[in-house]
Amino acid sequence: MKKTLNDKAYDFIVHKLSSGEIKPGQKLSEPSLAKACGISRTPMREAVRRLIEEGVLYQIVKSGTYVTGFGAKEVSDAYEIRSVIESAMLVEALEKLTRKDFAILQDTCDRMHAAIEAMRKAKMDIMTGKPENDFLKADILFHLTLLRASGNSLAEKIIVNAYRRNQFFGTHSHQRTLEHVALAWKFHCEILKACRAKNAPAAVKWLQDHIARSKHDALLPISRVSSF
């Protein structure tokens, strides 16, 4: 499916946020963004509106549009919402997962592993660039596949918003060392293994342990900064 100009504008801002080029608290200029993206202001305005609805941006009357600032509480809240909703939806999804779903889940685990191997081959201390991008895409697809299998579209929307926040403001707080990404991959593999066995308690435990560890790793750099 061909992307609309609205989607192009949205993806453009998302990339700027994810790369850290646009930072929390920064004021945005729609005309400048539209020019840099090579589109008119209308689709850029729609993209900004969409990100405001997702809580990533906010507007101040007669002042402008700003990137939401995220501290420890906001990061913690996003992970806690994920843990509660994803756990409940995982139980719902367990009896509904299809062969296609399992194929997607396995593929995401394989892609995460391939990204880790690319990291090893490049002798990276911290996963960055294409390996990181591939790893994160596979990570979120794994979780979204489980959510969609539950059939609860509202839960999916809430979690996507939480993921967006973690993606924009957690990507650069995480130190994606080999240990970090290898453990995340292991969590996904164990969740998949429990799902195949239709073992709900085990699947939920692995999921909650995974989210708890991700929350810990995301908050650690914030706590270090605040301690100075």
Predicted regions and their residues:
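Solvent-exposed loop and edge beta-strand segments that line ligand/cofactor-binding
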Residues: 176-180
